[in-house]
């Protein structure tokens, strides 16, 4: 309990809230059913017959000798051809809760969005509590919640991408995923050799810190080791992970670009909404720039402009603004989510309008499938919209907490130059304390040796086990320092924002090219 403290209390309360509240309220359902979204209904067979002048066929049944019933030829009686240029007007109705429960991937979408909301509440509550009562030796369980959100989002994106490899008709999509994955792998390899004074992701510092602390940890356990792995091997596996994540972001980015393109087309008269949409689309690019040191940190925290006695921002203020920008970008995307989803649902109307310009004939079943498939895949599109931004958000939250940053950096002055020496003194004191605890545990174990056949009291065994576990936990925490977390989650946050924008930009180029052609 001492290792968890208030974290366990917050987690247990949230688990109880999930159990009591989830049957009555769902943010995922509210987004789809209570934000004004409307779907298009396909015309019925009778309406199509009336518009096209196709007479109703009489069903000729033949007697089934086995059971004596009449069996109709359903395919001939329900399938007929109509002109493609038929003037069809589609009706719209608001999306109701009973309409979406049968949609594909609805359960996965609901779980991801609702669990993300609960995780955000746990994180916010923990941050507020730790602002007044800082962590000492406790485990921050809110990081486990954040990590689970990232895992669920990654798993769902992988599940959606695997669908392209299972279908025999998705050769183009399969090839696109492979090509973009290899392209992102190449880009990641190039980025990983960029020096730290240009792109401040902190991977080199993280590797050095992890290598040093891991070697010390292994030596303390009586194992000789020069380090876990070479830097080139570590960076290669990071690049492979970047390529895989880039492949998973490809079709969500293409879908996002199409929805953005259609949203701009439907809001030509509302310039303020068009401006907000464009700002939201460009926000990931601004986030990418904030990690480029000559364009962001050096310009805002080091350069002194004429007429000023100090830089515009302190180091702490810059870190806070960078983290806040990620949160603002994600919140803005969530606020614009109904507009983007309605732009997707309007594809049914666009398909009918495009079909009116074509010659030839189409069956009623094909027309109805063309219209109804838009709504059928609504939750798939919503997952493609939500999962990438949730990964960016919770990577940034983990980067802030595990990297030991603060949300109030704008209100603080820049720390003095001896900050590093103060941190070094703290680490030395921590190592000395760990050494003393290890010596105490060993002395206690030596004193607890009893003659053969005798047993230690249960209280002594429990105390010794607890002390050994706490010592092992402290040793493990000394391996994963804040520099390791800053490098790992800093790069994960930056790369997620980069491929978020790159995939969307690729989709916009695609839309521009094929629209003009």
Question: How would you name each of these model-derived features?
Answer:
Residues 48-90:
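Charge-rich, low-complexity intrinsically disordered and helical linker regions
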Residues 1-46, 83-100, 104-517:
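Alpha-helical transmembrane segments of secretory-pathway, organelle, and plasma-membrane proteins
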């Amino acid at each position: 309990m001492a290792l968890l403290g208030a974290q366990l209390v917050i987690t247990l309360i949230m688990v109880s809230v999930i159990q009591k509240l989830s049957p009555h309220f769902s943010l995922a359902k509210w987004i789809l059913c209570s934000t004004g979204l409307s779907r298009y209904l396909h015309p019925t067979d009778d309406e199509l017959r009336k518009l096209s002048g196709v007479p109703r066929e009489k069903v000729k049944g033949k007697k089934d000798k086995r059971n004596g019933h009449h069996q109709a030829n359903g395919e001939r009686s329900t399938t007929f051809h109509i002109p493609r240029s038929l003037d069809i007007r589609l009706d719209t109705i608001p999306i109701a809760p009973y309409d979406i429960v049968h949609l594909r991937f609805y359960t996965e979408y609901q779980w991801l969005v609702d669990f993300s909301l609960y995780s955000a509440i746990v994180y916010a509550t923990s941050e507020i509590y730790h602002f007044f009562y800082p962590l000492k030796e406790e485990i921050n369980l809110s990081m486990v919640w954040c990590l689970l959100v990232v895992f669920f989002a990654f798993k769902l994106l992988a599940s959606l991408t695997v669908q392209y490899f299972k279908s025999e008709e998705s050769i183009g999509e399969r090839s696109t995923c492979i090509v973009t994955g290899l392209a992102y792998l190449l880009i990641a390899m190039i980025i990983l050799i960029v020096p730290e004074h240009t792109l401040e992701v902190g991977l080199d510092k993280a590797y050095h810190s992890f290598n040093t602390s891991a070697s010390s940890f292994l030596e303390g356990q009586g194992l000789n080791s020069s380090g876990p792995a070479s830097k080139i091997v570590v960076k290669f596996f990071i690049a492979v992970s970047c390529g895989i994540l880039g492949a998973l972001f490809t079709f969500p980015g293409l879908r996002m670009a199409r929805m953005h393109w259609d949203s701009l087309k439907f809001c030509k008269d509302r310039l303020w909404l068009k401006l907000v949409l464009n700002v939201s689309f460009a926000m990931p690019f601004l986030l990418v720039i904030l990690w480029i040191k000559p364009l962001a940190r050096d310009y805002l925290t080091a350069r002194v402009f004429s007429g000023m006695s100090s830089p515009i921002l302190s180091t702490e203020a810059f870190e806070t603004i960078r983290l806040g920008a990620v949160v603002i970008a994600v919140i803005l995307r969530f606020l614009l989510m109904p507009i983007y989803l309605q732009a997707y649902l309007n594809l049914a109307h666009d398909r009918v309008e495009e079909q009116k310009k074509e010659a030839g004939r189409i069956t009623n079943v094909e027309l109805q499938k063309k219209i109804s498939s838009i709504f059928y895949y609504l939750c798939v599109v919503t997952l493609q919209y939500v999962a990438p931004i949730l990964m960016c958000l919770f990577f940034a939250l983990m980067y802030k907490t595990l990297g030991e940053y603060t949300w109030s950096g704008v209100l603080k002055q820049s720390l003095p130059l001896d900050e590093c020496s103060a941190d070094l003194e703290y680490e030395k004191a921590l190592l000395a304390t760990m050494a003393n605890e290890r010596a105490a545990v060993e002395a206690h174990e030596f004193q607890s040796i009893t003659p053969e056949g005798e047993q230690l009291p249960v209280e002594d065994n429990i105390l010794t086990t607890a002390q050994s576990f706490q010592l092992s936990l402290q040793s493990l925490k000394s391996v994963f320092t804040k520099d390791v977390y800053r490098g790992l989650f800093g790069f994960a946050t930056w790369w997620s924002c980069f491929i978020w924008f790159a995939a969307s930009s690729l989709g916009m180029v695609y839309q521009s090219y094929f629209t003009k052609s």
